[in-house]
Amino acid sequence: MSQQVIIFDTTLRDGEQALQASLSVKEKLQIALALERMGVDVMEVGFPVSSPGDFESVQTIARQVKNSRVCALARCVEKDIDVAAESLKVAEAFRIHTFIATSPMHIATKLRSTLDEVIERAIYMVKRARNYTDDVEFSCEDAGRTPIADLARVVEAAINAGATTINIPDTVGYTMPFEFAGIISGLYERVPNIDKAIISVHTHDDLGLAVGNSLAAVHAGARQVEGAMNGIGERAGNCSLEEVIMAIKVRKDILNVHTAINHQEIWRTSQLVSQICNMPIPANKAIVGSSAFAHSSGIHQDGVLKNRENYEIMTPESIGLNQIQLNLTSRSGRAAVKHRMDEMGYKESEYNLDNLYDAFLKLADKKGQVFDYDLEALAFIGKQQEEPEHFRLDYFSVQSGSNDIATAAVKLACGEEVKAEAANGNGPVDAVYQAINRITDYNVELVKYSLTAKGHGKDALGQVDIVANYNGRRFHGVGLATDIVESSAKAMVHVLNNIWRAAEVEKELQRKAQHNENNKETV
């Protein structure tokens, strides 16, 4: 009988560390709800002690996610564990994940400590975490470079202290699959109480071996795999969860394990993470790349037409990729749009039908036919822009040519007031951005600009993603339109609204802090 492998997602913690701009609370919640829908068993959603923003994100997700166990990271430090517990206590059940380095190099040069002191600290902190929850995960940082005898000592002590999951990370992506499997097997041989905990693995892709190492560990007895959607993460990234999940499904014959994942949600979750994180998926990416199910060789095409199993070990439908694209027109009613969203697997809570239908009609008037990918793009943008807006693009006009200096005129609604400015620039997009900067006096510095076609043909929607720097912080913005100058302008307005909202949140936090201080003085 096959055993279950627990899927532990760290897209919102380890994965976010790869992003040029931090995600907002709303963006993190959107990803968390998608991960819950996909069926991940555990989701690590932040490092609460690191910032008030991370604390708020963890607390918000812990309050709303019900079907996945929410987890927060904490160093083996009292304050870390206490703050993690405080952020998670709104959940019915939660996990605290605490860690400390165990390799000789890390102990000597980073911690300036000894193995005995590390073990003593690990025991104390695991017990402290157990005061808050019966679900405690302990990680041996840099386990891949820790001598097996030392690693076994730490693991045995952590389990005796109450750790219910023991995580073995290949922190720097150093080990080979056969070597990593040997570490897991070695622990099963050396740790007498190992049956009292789940053995987990967390691999990095520095040598391109993250997925291979995780699967080798599963074959050797690990029963939890940690990773991120699309493999995002520090340096070369984390283990790609979608690849591990589908490998377990496709090669059940040799691994004899299974997951509780809803495979039909893989593709949509992957796309959402890509869009929100502004990290395009390479065409040749396994499982979710646009070429993953494409066949260009004549021999392959002939074989697939005769029997798909000749060259396909899984189907697009098995990951929720519906290749039949139906089109709607401006004559399609609200019910038709809702029906199509239902067929694509969207719940009404995931989008605002009124806003989506209004955007659909405007797009249908421009391009005639609206396809599935158009609807998904409109729903995504609508979700991003549901929060209150201080800035709104009222009007823009650009003039440019091969021998002319680009000029833009922009009207921007700023609260209740509409302001207008004109500016020149190095091209129409730059001219629009210069005009917007004049209106707001924010002096936003553009760090990254990317344009992605959503759909096919000359009338495809253009999605612009930008990262901008303001007062030492980076903010992400996204815009969508058939006109790339318009989508560029919308992306910058989205950035401005994110800056404004961040300032409002900061004011509210200061107000609460002052209120608490006043209450202390009264007492």
UniProtKB/Swiss-Prot annotation:
Function: Catalyzes the condensation of the acetyl group of acetyl-CoA with 3-methyl-2-oxobutanoate (2-ketoisovalerate) to form 3-carboxy-3-hydroxy-4-methylpentanoate (2-isopropylmalate).
SMART domains, sorted: LeuA_dimer
Gene3D superfamilies: 1.10.238.260, 3.30.160.270, Aldolase class I
Coiled-coil intervals: none
Subunit structure: Homodimer.
Residues annotated for Mn(2+) binding in this entry: D14, H202, H204, N238
Location (main, coarse): cytoplasm
Family designation: Belongs to the alpha-IPM synthase/homocitrate synthase family. LeuA type 1 subfamily.
Gene field: leuA
Pathway: Amino-acid biosynthesis; L-leucine biosynthesis; L-leucine from 3-methyl-2-oxobutanoate: step 1/4
Reactions accelerated catalytically: 3-methyl-2-oxobutanoate + acetyl-CoA + H2O = (2S)-2-isopropylmalate + CoA + H(+)
The protein's name in its UniProt record: 2-isopropylmalate synthase
Domain of life: Bacteria
Disulfide-bond pairs as recorded: none
EC number of this enzyme: 2.3.3.13
GO biological process: L-leucine biosynthetic process
Compartments, as annotated in UniProt: Cytoplasm
Gene Ontology MF: a single term: acetyl-CoA C-acetyltransferase activity
Domain Pyruvate carboxyltransferase: 5-267
Matches recorded under InterPro entries: 2-IPM_HCS-like, 2-isopropylmalate_synth_dimer, AIPM/Hcit_synth_CS, Aldolase_TIM, LeuA/HCS_post-cat, LeuA_allosteric_dom_sf, LeuA_bact_synth, PYR_CT
Chain spans, region Regulatory domain: 392-523
